[in-house]
From Swiss-Prot:
Iron-sulfur as UniProt keyword: no
Top-level division of the source organism's lineage: Bacteria
InterPro entries found in the cross-reference section: AAA+_ATPase, ATPase_a/bsu_AS, ATPase_alpha/beta_chains, ATPase_F1/V1/A1_a/bsu_nucl-bd, ATPase_T3SS_FliI/YscN, FliI_clade1, P-loop_NTPase, T3SS_ATPase_C
Name of the molecule in the record: Flagellum-specific ATP synthase
Pfam family, one: T3SS_ATPase_C
Record bears the keyword Acyltransferase: no
Function: Probable catalytic subunit of a protein translocase for flagellum-specific export, or a proton translocase involved in local circuits at the flagellum.
Length: 451
């Protein structure tokens, strides 16, 4: 009962702020036209980012659609709808909504599947909110952030041993389609040692959303997770909100002192949603059709993850980045690499060979690994990569029998150790290996390979 009273009191705080503002008349506008995804209204007094209801009462069944103000030109205001526009006609009323855009938060979110507006998608009814918070969280002074100094055990041998992740790090999973991104995210969800896991499924096929929750995440993984899903058929504004909402959830729990794992699939769909919105309101395209606002929004989203101030919680974030045609120079992939603390590249060649997880350790890097592991561990990881790379350089010669043993001691050693190195990099979907076990296995592998 005490919890309910506390929750009710906190919820009232948001309404208190709204009603304490001086009362002003609501100035409605009228819908002039709709071009593509954009609504154009006139006679409206609303700031960019504010919400409105577009109401058509002329038909047999009144229609009401929520929209957000995205821009203006003179007396005209441009809005982007959140839902379907079926039934909206010229002359529809555009009514500004009071600024009560607060979202429900609380421990009751664990095990739930929500949309970008905080509504339940799992059929389990509404949540018991402990707090109501705005979509945009407070920014942290970069000089006050606690530095990344502690390793995070993700339960995946190749990452723990060779690409060690630090608690509070932000990484990208770069890959084309069908090489095991979602499966790798599912393994991280089940095996990572984190207090709370927040999963954002942005712009994925509806079928994949259910498959990820039921088969990859599983019942045990869902118990300590919050899933925010916005399928590909959602409006671009809803996809954008879903990415921001799951980040806000992670921030909320970090501010409560929790160590949070944030998994977002995918950052590319977030950028594409912003591209749809920007082009619809007339922003000129730039690199490969992406307007400048896309590249401005990426760091704003990513920078919200990371460590809090000393003594607080952390957000370790993994963002998947789709590389069109496996092109690592895709503009979104290139921009993401510049704002992330490392990247894991998934190789189609390895996936086709049945090598899972298909992490290309030569093309991947964890920029904070030197700060979170011992010097001996770092040397072993570098030595492993040297031997693996030496074998890959001579792979064609070895496969056709053109390499003569004894020609190069390093290549001879790489050939001798290749079977155990390949076994080290492979891992079953239900197999977990701790950071300490991965470290010991790496040291043992290299000790056996050095005469």
């Amino acid at each position: 009962m005490r919890l309910e009273r506390t929750s009710f009191a906190r919820r009232l705080e948001g309404y208190t702020e709204a009603v304490s503002l001086p009362a002003q008349p609501v100035v409605e506008g009228r819908l002039l036209r709709m071009v593509g995804l954009t609504l154009e209204a006139e006679g409206l007094q609303a700031a960019v980012g504010s919400r409105c209801n577009v109401i058509n009462e002329s038909g047999y069944h009144p229609v009401q659609v929520e929209a957000e103000v995205m821009g203006f030109s003179g007396s005209k205001v441009y809005l982007m709808p959140v839902g379907s526009l079926a039934g909206i006609a010229p002359g529809a009323r555009v009514v500004p909504l009071p600024d009560t855009g607060r979202l429900p938060m609380g421990m009751s979110m664990l095990g739930r599947v929500l949309d970008g507006a905080g509504r339940a998608l799992d059929g389990k009814g509404g949540m018991r909110a402990e707090d109501w918070v705005p979509m945009d969280g407070p920014t942290i002074n970069p000089l006050k952030r606690h530095p990344i100094s502690e390793p995070l055990d993700v339960g995946i041998r190749s990452i723990n041993g060779l690409l060690t992740v630090g608690r509070g790090q932000r990484l990208g999973l770069f890959a084309g389609t069908g090489v095991g991104k979602s499966v790798l995210l599912g393994m991280m969800t089940r095996f990572t040692r984190a207090d709370i896991i927040v999963v954002g499924l942005i712009g994925e096929r509806g079928r994949e959303v259910k498959e990820f929750i039921d088969e990859i995440l599983g019942e045990e993984g869902l118990k300590r997770s919050v899933v925010v899903a916005s399928p590909a058929d959602d409006a671009p504004l809803m996809r954008l909100r879903a990415a921001q909402y799951c980040t806000r959830i992670a921030e909320y729990f970090r501010d409560k002192g929790k160590n949070v794992l944030l998994l977002m699939d995918s950052l590319t769909r977030y950028a594409q949603a912003q591209r749809e919105i920007a082009l619809a309101i007339g922003e000129p395209p730039a690199t490969k059709g992406y307007p400048p606002s896309v590249f401005a929004k990426l760091p704003k989203l990513v920078e919200r993850a990371g460590n809090a101030e000393a003594g607080g919680g952390s957000i370790t974030a993994f963002y998947t980045v789709l590389s069109e045609g496996d092109d690592q120079q895709d503009p979104i992939a290139d921009a993401a690499r510049g704002v992330l603390d490392g990247h894991f590249v998934l190789s189609r060649r390895l996936a086709e060979e049945g090598h899972y997880p298909a992490i290309d350790i030569e093309a991947s890097i964890s920029r904070v690994m030197p700060q979170v592991v011992e010097a001996e561990h770092l040397r072993d990881a570098q030595r492993f990569k040297q031997l693996w790379s030496r074998y890959q350089q001579s792979r064609d010669l070895i496969s056709v029998g053109a390499y003569v043993a004894g020609g190069d001691p390093e290549t001879d050693l790489a050939i001798a150790r290749f079977p155990v190195m390949r076994q080290f990099l492979r891992q079953g979907l239900d197999e977990s290996e701790s950071l300490a076990e991965s470290r010991a296995r790496l040291a043992s592998l290299l000790a056996g390979g050095q005469a």
